[in-house]
Amino acid sequence: MPNLRILLKDEPNKRVLLLGNEAIARAILETGIGIVTTYPGTPASEIGDSISEIAKDANLYMEYSTNEMVAVEVAAGAANVGVRALTAMKHVGLNVAADAVMTLAYVGVKGGYVIVTADDPECYSSQNEQDNRYYALLSNLPCLEPSSPQEAKDMTLAAIEISEELELPVLLRTTTRVNHTRGPVTFGKLSKPNLKGKLVRDVKRMVMVPAHARLMHVELLKKVEKAKGISENSPYNTVTRKGKNQIGIISSSAAYNYAVEAADLLGLGASILKLGMTNPLPEKMIGQFLRANKKIIIVEELEPYLETQIKAIAKDHAPTVEIYGKTTRQYFPRKGELSTRLVAEALADITGKKIPIDFKKTDEAYAEIAKDLPARPPILCAGCPHRASFFVIKRVGGEKANYPTDIGCYALGIAPPLNVGDLLVCMGSGISTAQGMSRATGEPTIAIIGDSTFFHAAIPGLVNAVYNNATVTLAVLDNSTTAMTGHQPHPGTGITGMGSPAEKVSIEKVAEGCGVKFVKVVDPYKVEEAQAVLKEALQHTGPSVVIFRSPCTLVDLREKRHKGMKIVPYRVSDKCTNCMACVKLLGCPALILEDGKVQVDETLCVACGLCASVCPYNALESGGGQQ
């Protein structure tokens, strides 16, 4: 991440290379947003991280909330007393927040409020690739879709203005390629954030008992009609190219970039309608575009969101126009990312144009290069305490136990040789699915979860286990950070998103407060002690909690190096029989094979000592450890 203090520069017209997420952070400063809330999740994490780093200097408030629903509720409270707010989350986070968002559409806001929802086509870092544009339809909230970092900034500013004009939250739907693309962004003028609001009581609007909800639903539908006018006149809904061959392309978001490149590659000369405000759609503008063309090609990622609505518009405005997309011969896939190649192949198929590139040759060249490259599957880092925890868990539970798992670094425990993880659905699901497994199988069941995810979503499931006396064990892998998304703080870390000290919320006290009778904390590197405690937990009737506590190695190493401590790696002595136990049991990337013999990669070893604990011949010796 670059020096983010550049975001604080009040230099209008300055051009800077920024990630899409950093561009949104800059927009927060330009639009005078006073409160920013988030729960970290790729591909949206850098929005909150960027603001966290500069929040004090920017004189605004930022927090890493316990989960996305809390983040929305905190921001909604601010927006309803007149303070501009923004909440950032990944796409599945909107599932968590949906209960609040759906009713907030009825309540509305008084200060501008933007909800950034970052979709992840191709599931690069997610458990699904849902298309959150449908949340805009479902909630009747306006939705903007940027296609570049510059638009990410500009549309955030526009979203605030639309929000205040309609008195509604506005969804800013990004995708991974927009969030994580770095491009030139032109700065505007900074605005002073307003952190001082005032509650103007309006019980009918703000308290959603049934009688009020019925009335406010009517008001919401009136706002939708007003939003249609905004969409028709939005500068982000525009014909960017006018062709002469009566072929029209309609696209949005990152897919628009592929459509333009593919059309240029084929020399198609098509007209292109770019849609940046995609809920509500500009029906009149689209109808006019349909009438001006004989063939319409809709290029969008994931679901046929635009296509379905445009086909409905065509029935009224241009019933004879030919529309090509995902539902007509499936020219475009309903899964994964698009690419210039995929779009070019579809356009060629539809129009009969010839692609000037032999993609088969590029495939062959790629395959030739790739065959000599080592595989790099995602694995736990060398020295990761989760590896020690998994070794203990698998040694105790063996093949007889069931292992529902959760969202976080520890999901990588499914990989060999650890092979821990039987069912993964969503944040916090492990403890609840464990109860169903336990009751249905009668077998030992150990649910795996991390510390941040525990606070995010596990507590209701744990209460359920206590209430219904479920005999399950919850293994909390506590590495004192939200590691997978970038080491953000959480309620158990003792620091806030503002960098201020905070009360550490104790996982063990929370578990005890929920009524769990068996709660113990272990050091996963003390293998024998940890195994004994886990065995005891499995013999307990009712829910039990074992907290495997050891700091994330990356954070720990950073702190030790900052203090000038030296890491002296382990070494393989001549006692080694090459039994391969360390490799077969742990899969640590610091254990490598050279000439058929186990060696320690000194550039990766962090001297955690786990390999020495499992070696039956005491062949792995400390070179001095962490000094």
Task: Show which residues each predicted segment covers.
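Thiamine diphosphate
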Residues: 1-149, 177, 242-243, 269, 412-547, 555-559, ...
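Flexible, low-complexity linker and terminal segments
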Residues: 2-21, 25, 146-380, 385-386, ...
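Short acidic, glycine/serine/threonine-rich loops at helix termini
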Residues: 47-50, 74-76, 97-101, 123-130, ...
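A glycine-rich helix N-cap at a beta->alpha junction
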Residues: 58-66, 107-118, 198-202, 469-480, ...
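Short beta-alpha connecting loops at secondary-structure transitions
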Residues: 59-60, 118-123, 139-144, 294, ...
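Conserved thiamine diphosphate
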Residues: 120-169, 175, 203, 208-211, ...
